[in-house]
Regions:
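Active-site neighborhoods of divalent-metal-dependent phosphate/nucleic-acid chemistry enzymes
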Residues: 81-124
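Acidic, PIN/NYN-like endoribonuclease modules and their adjacent C-terminal/linker elements
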Residues: 45, 114, 118-163
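PIN-domain endoribonuclease scaffold, especially VapC-family toxins
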Residues: 34-39, 47-97
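Glycine-rich, phosphate-binding/catalytic loops in enzymes
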Residues: 20-23, 60, 141-144
Length: 163
């Protein structure tokens, strides 16, 4: 598996997302374990995704599976079999943030993941961030796939999840 992992997946894997259930946590642990064992995580060359991971996870790799994944990514930064880094370009445009994206209203903190997905064509793994479902028209327009690991938590209200 080759994928971009939204930070919320790692937080849920650690059991720290209060509204995620045990099934969601298991799905997140399973996904990041599969990537760690025989997959590739895709990051940006500027370090934005890694910086966000660092804000929520521990370099020691403990105490949870999300922390272990972060340590795995950090330790394998220069192993092209485990970590792929793609180039994205920052632009001075509040409506885009990255050259790879059209004007959009996606949460600014999520735009780096989308820009990496546009360049790499890898899917984004999401657990609990409903912004991805809210932005499904944008995501479709740039031909990106968001894999919802926990569809029961990835929408606002009772609206059906669009995949």
């Amino acid at each position: 598996m080759r994928a971009i992992v939204d930070t919320n997946v790692l937080v849920v894997a650690n059991g720290l997302e209060t509204h995620a259930d045990a099934e969601c946590q298991r799905e997140c642990v399973s996904a990041i374990t599969a990537i760690s064992v025989n997959g590739t995580v895709v990051l940006d060359n500027l370090g934005f995704i890694l910086d966000e991971y660092q804000e929520h996870l521990n370099f020691s790799g403990q105490p949870g599976p999300g922390d272990a994944f972060f340590k795995h990514v950090y330790d394998n930064m220069y192993s092209s079999k485990r970590v792929e880094r793609v180039s994205i370009t920052v632009v001075d445009d509040e409506k885009r943030a990255f050259e790879e994206l059209p004007a959009n209203t996606l949460d600014r903190s999520d735009r780096k993941f989308l820009a990496v997905a546009v360049v790499s064509k890898a899917p984004i793994l999401n657990a609990t961030d409903s912004d991805w479902d809210d932005a499904r028209a944008l995501i479709s327009s740039v031909e990106v796939v968001v894999k919802q690991l926990c569809p029961q938590h990835a929408t606002r209200g009772n609206r059906p999840l669009q995949t």
